[in-house]
Amino acid sequence: MSAVSESVLSLSRYYLPVYRPCQVVLVRGQGSRVWDEQGRDYLDLAAGIAVCCLGHCDPDLVAALVEQAGRLWHTSNVFYSEPSLRLAQELVDVSRFAERVFLCSSGTEANEAAIKLVRKWAAAQGRLPEHRTIVTFHGSFHGRTLAAVTATAQPKYQEGYEPLPGGFRYVDFNHIEALEAAMVGGDVAAVMLEPIQGEGGVMPVVSGYLAQVRALCDRYGALLVLDEIQCGMGRTGTLFAYWQEEVVPDIVTLAKGLGGGFPIGAMLAGPKVAEVMQFGAHGTTFGGNPMAAAVARVALRKLASVEIAANVQRQSVALRAGLEEISEAFGGVFTQVRGRGLMLGAVLAPLYAGQASAILEVAVEHGVLLLQAGPDVLRFVPALNVSDEELADGLVRLRAALGDYVSRFGG
């Protein structure tokens, strides 16, 4: 490690130690490549946790940011700004269901807004507080704030934050009978789920499941809330993942790829709930920030293009095939590659169970950046415009990394 790296990393003692970053200082990015301060390049198949959907420093996004930065940075929602109004209109137009949009700065905020909207809607329906339950799913991830982490049905994220807010109920993912059993009492106001669980192991809904959930929501008078913070914005091959299931949600939450790397979140509200929240019912200082909205407008236009959809489909096939070939080359290091589009998870074989984090460290040594989705799954969420050459290079580096790991630790 260079003196520059050591100097920069020494500053980490001033940061609340809630993260455990890789010991690399990244200073520049272009497309699907990033460079550290020593000039070494890395092929980025993580995209800032599915955020940089158009790669690093996309010229159109940079131009939008620079132009808006020279005009107006921030107004708050005490005043209108054109970029946020235009973005809201464009999100409504492309969503195929929404009538209104709430803009915020992160996925957690979008989910908090959705949770509050559900509760407000139930109250407006005359439902007692005990009849405003929100059902979520084991393995889910909806954010880190107190309500969102309670909606996240994973104890490891909740430990030590008790007492948690009430009014949530957990059921098994992809288990329609369990969901109906949780709803039959008539106290459920909403069902909230990810079409593909990200942190839960890159686990997609089974075919037809969302339609069954929609039917149960209609039967028992509940809203359907879809968290597309990670799987939305073109990542699965369609702009919204729910399009592939042909269901109509009541609420959809977005973030990550919506800003192409600039912080922004959004909650989209359908006709049943669009007028529930009126003046003073909710708010945010930074939501709808002109710079974030200006960038998101360009990102949305590009992510909704047929070119991006076609590239996602083509590169998904190539990535899946490459992972399966690598697995076979090393005696079946993966038992399964699952997911949709460019949101794929490679499930580690029993011999390597629990070793995802260690594999990621070796991958960095070989110049490829990955993620994990739990201890047993390697997660791949590259830029949606990743090129043939970039993806091929990433697979070459991954093959070398796994070969190194297997030889060192696989026995």
Curated annotation (Swiss-Prot):
Residues noted as binding pyridoxal 5'-phosphate in the record, renumbered to the chain: 107-108, 141, 227-230, 285
Pathway(s) this gene product operates in, as recorded in its UniProt entry: Amino-acid biosynthesis; L-arginine biosynthesis; N(2)-acetyl-L-ornithine from L-glutamate: step 4/4
PROSITE patterns tied to this protein: AA_TRANSFER_CLASS_3
Compartment list: Cytoplasm
Name of the protein in its database record: Acetylornithine aminotransferase
Naturally occurring in which organism (per UniProt): Xylella fastidiosa (strain 9a5c)
Required cofactor(s): pyridoxal 5'-phosphate
Gene it is expressed from: argD
Residues carrying N6-(pyridoxal phosphate)lysine: 256
Single GO biological process annotation from the record: L-arginine biosynthetic process
Keyword annotations of the record: Amino-acid biosynthesis, Aminotransferase, Arginine biosynthesis, Cytoplasm, Pyridoxal phosphate, Transferase
